[in-house]
Amino acid sequence: MKANIHPEYHKIKVVMTDGTEYETFSTWGTEGQVMNLDIDSKSHPAWTGGNQQLMDRGGRLSKFNKRFGGLGL
């Protein structure tokens, strides 16, 4: 393997949608940074089997529905 080509691997804190926190190692962010999840295995319909409403962060879902909601598929 070549030296000095791999990203830094450090410990971060992950906060799930229900507030559960855990620490893991990642190349994301910097040492000690917190990653807040918008959706995870406890809230995603693919894993819960439900038909839950998705959280609209940043208005993206609203913008999509406004643009394509009238198609009636």
From Swiss-Prot:
* An annotated GO cellular component: ribosome
InterPro entries (alphabetical):
Ribosomal_bL28/bL31-like_sf, Ribosomal_bL31, Ribosomal_bL31_A, Ribosomal_bL31_sf
| Highest taxon, organism lineage | Bacteria
Pfam families xrefs: Ribosomal_L31
This entry's Gene Ontology molecular function terms read: rRNA binding; structural constituent of ribosome
The biological process GO terms on file are: translation
Which Gene3D superfamilies does this UniProt record tie to the protein?
Ribosomal protein L31 (4.10.830.30)
Read off the PROSITE patterns from this record.
RIBOSOMAL_L31
The answer to keyword tRNA-binding applying to this record is no
Q: Does the keyword RNA-binding apply?
A: yes
The protein's UniProt keywords, in alphabetical order, are: Ribonucleoprotein, Ribosomal protein, RNA-binding, rRNA-binding
Provide the assembly information: Part of the 50S ribosomal subunit.
Q: What does this protein do?
A: Binds the 23S rRNA.
What's this protein's family per the entry? Belongs to the bacterial ribosomal protein bL31 family. Type A subfamily.
Tell me the protein's name. Answer: Large ribosomal subunit protein bL31
The scientific name of the source species is Allorhizobium ampelinum (strain ATCC BAA-846 / DSM 112012 / S4) (Agrobacterium vitis (strain S4))
